[in-house]
Amino acid sequence: MSRSPSNPKGTRDFLPSTLSKRNYILDIIKDNFKLFGFLEIETPALEKNSTLLGKYGNEGDSLVFKILNSGDKVKKADVNSLKQNNLSAFIDSISEKGLRYDLTVPLARFVAQHQNELVFPFKRYQIQNVWRADRPQHGRFQEFTQCDADVIGPKSIIQEIELIKLYDAVFSQLGFNDIIFKINHRSILTALANYIGAQNKLNEFISIIDKIDKIGLENVLEEVKKLLNDDSVSKLSTLLIENENSMQTLNDLFGDTSQAKKGIDELTSILEFINDNKCLNNEIKFDITLARGLNYYTGTIIEVVSKSNTAVGSLGGGGRYDNLTSLFNLKNTSGVGISFGLDRIYLEMEEKKMFPDDLDNHFDIVVINFGLNYIKKLYPLIDSLRKKGKKISIYPEKTKLNKQFSYGDKYKATYAILMGENEFNKNEIIIKNMKDGTQSFHSIKEVNSSLF
């Protein structure tokens, strides 16, 4: 018995009703990208493994989808490594390319490759799919769409402020009023690691701290204890529980180190600018536990969460990366960017019924089919109405009226246009209101000139 067809786990098909809602979100994001001066680019779905790997940490690298070589390249497979159970070396021998994990690393490659063709500071936005070999679960997929905005060029906290304001503009326009923009700084995380004795295990420590929203403070402290010792856990616990998110406490603890002072000063300037100008509709706050465990962040870190639904995870995030383009031989070029989690935003809006009611109205008018000659006579009118922006669908065959009206109902058509034999002879049509069932007779000329 044959199995019914299905898509791979962790991926989705999008029905028209779903896609109209996703496009509603995307249109608002795109419009705001343009309002803030960003230009659109695209990069290939495939990147060289040498471009992708080594940029996301060990956990991130393990989630890159690798693509098997084809043709004669398969003959280069390192069979000895496979026999010795060295799977990493074996996979490297049969794969030179992978699916992009995010849009930021491909951007760094793009900027380095096309630097002589770009104007700096270069503000780009990009909306494309990315792939991660993650365990599929609610709000987490193996294929999903990222919507990124980045600035490459001279470093200034104005860029961070503008990106936070961009976030706020989009989420406000989408109807969110319970958003928190969390910010932290990589140098503060480094100072925190030094303070508890984790300076030699910085990446491991940041990876643990980054899990606090998923596994809770108690479990984070337990993992830190395994990594370090009881004294380290005591220091971290005291700081997080008793003086949580106090910039003054951080200044007292770390302010005498130039590295920590840089981060504290930058975040203080960002918060003061935003609070003094009262330019956000949503809340912004400093969060010392915000880590976003990606190895390429070097400065400010940003994350977007909903107060009322933390289960879905972050709705967006980003930060500053000063060294990423240097991996592609473009030195001394800073970057900062943010990403919108389209799929999670969609889930949140769907759960809260935040979408406009008319998004399911796939066309305005359904034309009832009484035969080809009738459609032929109606076609100049149909063509004229389409030029005026009306969305019109002609039922493709002459069949029972109930079936044709049902078709219009299911696609939320507002009106139906009918032309039977009597109307044909009189150059008239019937317009039926699909909402209340009322109908009226009109000349074709009248409809064309004013009715719609």
Question: Which residue ranges define each predicted feature?
Answer:
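Auxiliary tRNA-acceptor-end handling modules of aminoacyl-tRNA synthetases
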Residues: 1-22, 76, 83-92
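A short beta-strand-loop structural module common to alpha/beta enzyme folds
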Residues: 39-45
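Short, surface-exposed recognition loops or helix-turn segments adjacent to catalytic cores
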Residues: 178-188, 205, 284-289
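A generic structural motif
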Residues: 182-183, 205-210, 392-401
